[in-house]
């Protein structure tokens, strides 16, 4: 079977859909289609695929390879750029405003200390150090499972993976990550995490370019630091790398687990549940520990299998929001919009970024 499929192109000139492809389509044919869609000459194409985005080898000796061999599948998003003849961009420091006040300095210091505190928790866990009660907890070597079905056939955990409900605000991603890192449900870590992300993005304008971010690097850095800006894949990836821990996002709409940091071979992982618009952290209650466990060794597959089961059951019972069909109201001009696509297009045309689900 070689059924037809489509891929999505993202470029500075807009987004395009390339249809009627199949696994036997050659890379050379795809290059021609991309060039036609984006009006970029084939020799000037620079294409990135996957996340984090990695360059796709478009050399002539690969042009006869088919898409199956190359690893391009249905629904893939390709970031298309035009090769630049000028020198690569340099890092642009974040704008700090004129005359930083003592209060701003104190806030920056508080953010840094908070980040160091979370990172120190992870270092203690990684080295087998003790963690105070009330802080984050990791299950390292529990006794054999009394009820194997509770953690999966390959697990060593006597516990059940559960969802911790966090406030449904624009910072639910950061609140969830804060909880799995140190066991606290609060907004204190959100501003700090947004600042970390802005710093990382600002420091690498080549990787985090207009095509990847959907806006200029400087605009993104200002946007992500606003309290009403949502986080997603880019932000999860950056925080995974910053904290040195794999963050597994359990996508219940598609019944899959997206493993951020998998390629870094981190030894520990945490789980977040994503329903299409909202994130909640997952934790495990065990008989051995009064403090819920939120961080797990990557090699312990029992917990991972529980997360897969949660995804499958939630999808079956439709416990997710279809972002292509939900209704939003622009809080700036009261216009009604259907789906994420209309909201993004409205934001691009008007600059409005405050939306409320109806």
UniProtKB/Swiss-Prot annotation:
Stretches the record annotates as Cys-loop: 166-172
Region feature S2 site, mapped onto this chain: 301-306
Gene Ontology CC: cytosol; nucleus
Annotated GO biological process: endoplasmic reticulum unfolded protein response; ERAD pathway; protein deubiquitination
Disulphide connectivity of cysteines: none
Chain ranges of the Ubiquitin-like domain: 5-87
OTU domain residues: 161-285
Keyword Zinc: yes
Zinc finger (C2H2-type) stretch: 328-352
Region (Disordered): 83-108
Alphabetized UniProt keyword annotations: Hydrolase, Metal-binding, Protease, Thiol protease, Ubl conjugation pathway, Zinc, Zinc-finger
Feature: compositional bias, Polar residues: 89-102
Broadest EC class assigned to this enzyme: hydrolase
Keyword match Metal-binding: yes
Active site: 169, 172 (nucleophile), 278, 352
EC number: 3.4.19.12
Annotated protein name in UniProt: Ubiquitin thioesterase OTU1
Source species of the chain: Drosophila pseudoobscura pseudoobscura (Fruit fly)
Lineage: Eukaryota, Metazoa, Ecdysozoa, Arthropoda, Hexapoda
